[in-house]
């Protein structure tokens, strides 16, 4: 029995039961009126009593900022009813925090003025198995006047999900979670295990820790589909069940927090940084997604290549076309570009391929006889320095733009693009994705698709943070970038 008071029940886009319909996040009102505030306050009472029955005494109200860091304000459980109806105050300036907690400014956000309200999602409040006595609650951010805040990343994802529904589409998403577990030793990373990559030796070395990570996630309603040791030193990975886009982003934020909490209880630290040690394989945050209409997976059962339907191909084509700009969203840190290098299965080239782990966009078709439930897209160039809500919403926006324009996929690539000559790459229309944060920010700045989707306040704040971090790390070495950001995510 999950401890989550309203766990998102989903299916795994990389495994079984991909059909949509479960785990759909409730859509919030655009403007809160007095009756809605009273209704929220009333609903919070039973939730608080149920939380108290599990031993919870304090609630962390959490949001993910434009650097990918989860920020929080906490309240005693007795304040939940008030917070549910009227929120908890915060400054808009958090939207222009940098990864080192410096503050920049954007066209719309910055400075000491203004206030927002954090309203917990009562359907997702979850007792934390790895942090007894605490509960986690993702928040939606509203203005003092009760309007949805234009810079709220979670609301952006919800808005894009609604736009997809207007096209008759349901989306299922899941983020892979890779992390390195270890400790800091004289400024260097010391892995918690020494066994070979993917080996049972690592499982034995971290047996109790690994079991507790999986058990904690399951108790919190996050269904773990797979857990395994990964390639880099001290690196592990989990794959979780799919859900609708908002719930998938919630699950990603909760999974990372849970792993961090369990790690601390074992005397370890968990790093989700794209580059834990410069020059080695980094942590990815690949996104899997499937798109459905009337119960049909648009990536299977159609007349196109590998069973793609027309709208399935158009959605994928839209994502592929926007990948340079999407890279700034899904690989948004200076450390991202220490990971995003060719021939490392990171997806460093703007291309697609069936089951090609070097392509930035991988079509996963599944085995014969079950493609209709398993087929999905994997975006491989993303990592966990990203805000999962911005990633989910931006990918939907790109895919919908592809459907509107009738986008077509180019010829696929079935090997490592890095093995091709410059002339061969040019002849096939394959380009390297941005190789640094300044280039990625420029690509984002030129994207009318993402600007229109996010709206200027959110878009400009996010872009300002990217520009400021590009300047912050402009003269830093790879070793310095990795060391300075290792424990920030």
Predicted regions and their residues:
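Catalytic-core signal marking the mid-to-C-terminal active-site face
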Residues: 2-3, 13-34, 42-49, 254, ...
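ATP/Mg2+-dependent ligation/transfer catalytic cores
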Residues: 2-226, 248-251, 390, 428-489
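Secondary-structure transition/capping motifs at alpha-helix termini
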Residues: 53, 165-168, 245-249, 260-270, ...
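Short glycine/proline-enriched loop/turn "hinge" motifs that connect secondary-structure elements
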Residues: 126-133, 170-172, 227-232, 280, ...
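Core alpha/beta catalytic barrel or barrel-like domain that forms the active/cofactor pocket
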Residues: 172-183, 220-240, 270-286, 290, ...
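Active-site-proximal beta-alpha loop/turn segments in soluble metabolic enzymes
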Residues: 181, 190-200, 233-247, 277-282, ...
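Short, contiguous, pocket-lining structural segments
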Residues: 201-209, 226-232, 244-255, 259, ...
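Accessory "access/gating" subregions that flank catalytic or transport cores
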Residues: 203-213, 218-224, 238-245, 256-272, ...
């Amino acid at each position: 029995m999950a401890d989550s008071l309203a766990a998102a029940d989903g299916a795994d886009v990389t495994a079984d039961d991909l059909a949509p319909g479960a785990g759909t996040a409730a859509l919030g009102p655009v403007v809160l009126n007095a009756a809605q505030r009273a209704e929220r306050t009333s609903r919070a009472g039973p939730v608080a009593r149920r939380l108290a029955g599990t031993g919870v005494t304090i609630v962390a109200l959490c949001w993910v900022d434009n650097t990918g860091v989860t920020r929080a304000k906490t309240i005693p459980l007795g304040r939940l009813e008030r917070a549910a109806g009227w929120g908890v105050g915060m400054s808009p300036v958090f939207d222009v925090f940098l990864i080192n907690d410096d503050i920049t400014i954007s066209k719309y956000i910055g400075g000491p003025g203004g206030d927002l309200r954090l309203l917990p999602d009562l359907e997702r409040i979850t007792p934390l198995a790895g942090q007894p006595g605490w509960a986690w609650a993702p928040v939606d951010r509203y203005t003092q006047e009760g309007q949805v805040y234009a810079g709220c990343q979670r609301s952006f994802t919800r808005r894009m999900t609604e736009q997809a529904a207007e096209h008759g589409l349901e989306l299922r998403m899941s983020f892979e979670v890779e992390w390195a577990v270890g400790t800091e030793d004289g400024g260097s990373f010391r892995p918690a295990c020494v066994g070979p990559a993917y080996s049972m030796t690592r499982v034995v070395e971290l047996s109790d820790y690994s079991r507790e990570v999986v058990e904690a996630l399951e108790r919190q309603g996050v269904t773990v589909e797979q857990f395994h040791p990964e390639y880099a030193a001290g690196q592990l990975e989990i794959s979780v069940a799919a859900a609708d886009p908002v719930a998938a982003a919630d699950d990603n934020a909760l999974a990372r927090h849970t792993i961090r909490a369990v790690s601390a209880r074992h005397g370890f630290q968990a790093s989700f940084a794209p580059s834990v040690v410069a020059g080695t394989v980094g942590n990815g945050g690949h996104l899997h997604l499937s798109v459905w209409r009337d119960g049909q997976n648009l990536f299977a059962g159609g007349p196109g290549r590998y069973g793609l339907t027309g709208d399935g191909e158009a959605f994928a084509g839209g994502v592929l076309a926007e990948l340079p700009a999407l890279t700034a969203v899904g690989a948004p840190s200076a450390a991202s570009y220490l990971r995003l290098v060719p021939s490392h299965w990171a997806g460093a080239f703007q291309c697609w391929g069936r089951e090609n782990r070097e392509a930035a966009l991988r079509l996963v078709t599944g085995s014969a006889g079950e493609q209709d439930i398993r087929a999905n897209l994997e975006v491989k160039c993303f990592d966990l320095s990203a805000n999962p809500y911005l990633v989910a919403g931006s990918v939907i926006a790109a895919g919908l733009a592809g459907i509107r324009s009738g986008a077509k996929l180019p010829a696929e690539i079935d090997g490592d693009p890095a093995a091709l000559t410059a002339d061969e790459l040019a002849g096939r229309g394959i380009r390297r994705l941005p190789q640094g944060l300044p280039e990625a920010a420029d690509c984002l700045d030129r994207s009318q698709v993402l600007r229109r989707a996010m709206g200027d306040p959110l878009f400009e704040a996010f872009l300002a943070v990217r520009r400021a971090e590009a300047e912050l790390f402009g003269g830093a070495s790879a070793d310095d970038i990795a060391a300075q950001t290792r424990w920030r995510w």
